[in-house]
A protein has these predicted regions:
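Membrane-interface "cap" regions at the ends of multi-pass membrane proteins
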Residues: 1-36, 41-47, 59-64, 76, ...
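Helix-loop-helix connectors at the membrane interface of multi-pass transporters/channels
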Residues: 1-8, 81-84, 90, 111-131, ...
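Helix-loop-helix junctions that connect adjacent transmembrane segments
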Residues: 6-11, 48-49, 123-126, 158-291
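Extracellular loop-to-transmembrane helix junctions
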Residues: 12, 25, 35-130, 134, ...
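Membrane-helix boundary/coupling elements in multi-pass transport proteins
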Residues: 75, 98-112, 215-228, 250, ...
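TM-loop-TM module centered on a large, flexible mid-protein loop between adjacent transmembrane helices
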Residues: 81-82, 88, 120, 194, ...
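Membrane-interface loop-to-helix entry segments
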Residues: 128-185, 216, 239-243, 365-378, ...
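C-terminal membrane-solvent junction of multi-pass transporters and transport-like membrane proteins
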Residues: 155-156, 325-333, 373-430, 456-459, ...
């Protein structure tokens, strides 16, 4: 039955309720919130709040669509599997490999950020060694069991949540005029420096493209929930709470920032928005505090990148879209080959960075630029078609997308519009082209895989779980 959970013979159900709950929260708190928000603020000014609002609404819609499909058929392959079933094997194959590639690139990038911070604390140890040790340590943790990943991520996520909530409380006290250690209050900075939207709506759109990357990872909970005892309950809970999570962690914290510091403050991009607020409030060791928070965030992101990349590779293998060896598991029911190969691919990109021409590595990085939007587009199209398939088969739909199919079509149109805008904007043009070329390259391998595996990748998968 479509709505019935099919336990995998190879993956366990080691994630507890608290693990999945915290994973759903951690998924929307990426390191880019702390690192990249200053760039978005400098681009759009206080109107960056609109950029985060629009991007947040898009993620809420996407998560609702994804949850509708995930509750009906929980699967480690998540949207890649649903694209298989609703659009065709070629779609699930392509978006699955693109998504895997995205997280493979995240691994060395996040490891490098963490290593730079640690190197600033211990200058005697080279950056490359810190990066290597962090990556190998988290790889080892992911090899042990999914429970290890869940437990480690639980505490990292908890630290991030506490840090953001403390920042919001501190900022609220300052805005209301009750903070005794700095002469700052009110929200006049929202319009004092050129108005609320000083650079126009075009800048808001540019900032939204920057903020979009921050939300990538919200969908991980639908992958992780498949390795728990009651995936549909966890997915429903995570989806229903995504609105307040985005409101608190993004809108509230960014509001605090733009209300307390001028958006055009000198050095904002280099110092960072959150650290700038802490220094304004004369918080001692502001740089050390933010370095610690960023270190926790990038470690959490790196941990999730290893987990997510390995599960997507495992799912592709189970569906016949990757070599069979990538679907092997160990005694802990962990896809160890997928974990090791994902880590190996990440190390390979580092080698390319050092030895290949700079243009090659730039293409590799740019090729991940529009993957988030492609993932969202595939989710929307899959949900549009999956609902009809479910209804035709008389399957139970426990969680429904709002105002179907109108909101779904609106999301599809909006994402298409954004991709077209990116294509004609010099700052994002190369990202769209690089991602498009990579996607076309993957699609071109479909006939090769079809002959090798003797599969028909242009057909749709039957509606059954492949978890």
């Amino acid at each position: 039955m479509m709505g019935q959970l099919s336990q995998s013979q190879d993956l366990g159900a080691g994630l507890k309720s608290r693990h999945v709950t915290m994973l759903s929260i951690a998924g929307v708190i990426g390191a880019s919130l702390f690192v990249g928000s200053s760039v978005a603020i400098a681009e759009a000014g206080p109107a960056v709040l609109l950029a985060y609002l629009f991007a947040g609404l898009l993620v809420v819609m996407i998560m609702r669509m994804l949850a509708e499909m995930a509750v009906a058929t929980p699967d480690t392959g998540s949207f890649s599997t649903y694209a298989d079933k609703a659009i065709g094997r070629w779609a699930g194959y392509t978006i699955g490999w693109l998504y895997w590639w995205f997280w493979v690139l995240v691994i060395p990038l996040e490891a490098n950020i963490a290593a730079i911070i640690l190197h600033s604390w211990v200058p005697g140890v080279p950056v490359w060694l810190f990066s290597l040790v962090i990556t190998l340590a988290l790889t080892g943790s992911n090899l042990l069991s999914v429970k290890n990943y869940g437990e480690f991520e639980f505490w990292l996520a908890l630290c991030k949540v506490v840090a953001i909530l403390a920042f919001i409380v501190l900022g609220a006290v300052a805005i209301t005029g009750f903070y005794p250690y700095a002469e700052v209050s009110g929200i006049s900075r929202l319009w004092d420096h050129g108005g609320f939207m000083p650079n126009g709506f075009g800048a808001v759109l540019s900032a939204m493209l920057i903020t979009m990357f921050s939300f990538m990872g919200a969908e991980i909970v639908t992958i992780a929930a498949a390795e728990s005892d009651t995936p549909h309950k966890h997915i429903v809970r995570a989806t229903n709470s995504v609105i307040w999570r985005i409101s608190i962690f993004y809108l509230c914290s960014i509001f605090i920032v733009v209300a307390l510091i001028p958006w055009n403050m000198q050095g904002l991009k280099s110092i960072g928005s959150y650290r700038s607020v802490l220094e304004l409030l004369h918080i001692p060791y502001a740089k050390l505090i933010m370095d610690g928070v960023i270190l926790l965030s990038v470690t959490s992101c790196l941990n999730s990148a290893l987990y997510t990349a390995s599960r997507m590779l495992y799912s592709l293998s189970r569906r016949g879209d990757a070599p069979t060896i990538m679907g092997r598991t160990n005694r802990s029911k962990t896809p160890y080959v997928a974990v090791l190969l994902s880590t190996g691919a990440a190390f390979l990109t580092v080698v390319v960075n050092y030895y290949a021409p700079a243009k090659v590595f730039k293409f590799l990085i740019d090729s991940s630029g529009a993957i988030a939007l492609l993932v969202y587009l595939v989710i929307a199209v899959s949900q549009l078609r999956m609902r009809k398939i479910l209804q035709a088969q008389g399957g139970e739909i426990r969680l429904r997308m709002w105002l179907y199919p109108y909101l779904t079509w609106l999301v599809i149109a909006f994402i298409t519009f954004v991709l077209v805008v990116m294509l004609f904007r010099p700052a994002q043009q190369l990202e769209v082209i690089s991602t498009g070329l990579l996607a076309l390259g993957i699609i071109c391998t479909v006939p090769i895989m079809s002959r090798w595996k003797k599969l028909v990748l242009w057909q749709k998968l039957p509606l059954q779980n492949t978890r």
